[in-house]
Amino acid sequence: YPRAEILVVNDGSDDETASRAEESGATVISHPVSLGNGAAVKSGARAASGDVLVMMDGDGQHKADDIQSLVDKLAEGYNMAIGARDSGSHAGVGRLAANGLYNVFASMISGHRIPDLTSGFRAVRADLFKKFLYLLPNGFSYPTNITMAFLRSGYPVTFIPIKADKRTGKSHIRPIRDGLRFMAIIFKIATLYAPLKVFLPISGLFFISGISYYAYTFFTMGRFTNMSMLILSASVIIFLIG
């Protein structure tokens, strides 16, 4: 890609990342300390001058040969094209299962099928991406936020099947801690973009529980209990929150 502007964001690495990238002809943007994956992406997006942004992780798992298929989708009218990894490209069964859970929940919230919510390999129209920079966190969850933001804003998004190589280097993600944080992030996004899809089922569950408990106490004790009223009141409050 001789006409491409290649930017490498060095997020506080103290190895030879920056010097080797510069020797290869890339423009290097260096953070004095590690600010996070999302912060690195935002720095690169602000510095980029092109109409199309292509983002790849720096761990060697994404293939440059797949870039053209992503960019071609933008020419077809999509605003973002994402490389969706196959099942063999995930680091272990646990990571595959966790990502599958995220994908199902995000698909339910967005109303669109999302085969790979956490993929960092994507092509996107620069002007639209930059409009959402203020929403993106500095941490690893930027792919989730930008994908959900585009889908809920009505911008066409597509997914292209890719096969990712095994990553090089050590992952800093802790499955349990970061998995819980990730679910919390998806929940926050859901409450921002589609609150009723979260709160309506919860409200319905409380309502059914309250009615069922009322029926049980009425037929067994012949009276309406305070607990039934409390559960039904909780149902109404949760619905109003949504």
Enumerate the language-model features and the residues they cover.
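Structured catalytic core of nucleotide-sugar glycosyltransferases
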Residues: 1-100, 108, 123-134, 145-152, ...
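Short glycine/serine/threonine-biased micro-segments
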Residues: 10, 34-36, 48, 75, ...
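Short, basic, helix/turn surface patches
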Residues: 58-64, 108-113, 185-197
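Short, non-helical or kinked segments that cap or interrupt transmembrane helices
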Residues: 63-67, 116, 175, 224
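A recurrent flexible, glycine/aromatic-enriched loop bordering the glycosyltransferase active site
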Residues: 86-93, 107-121, 139, 167-169
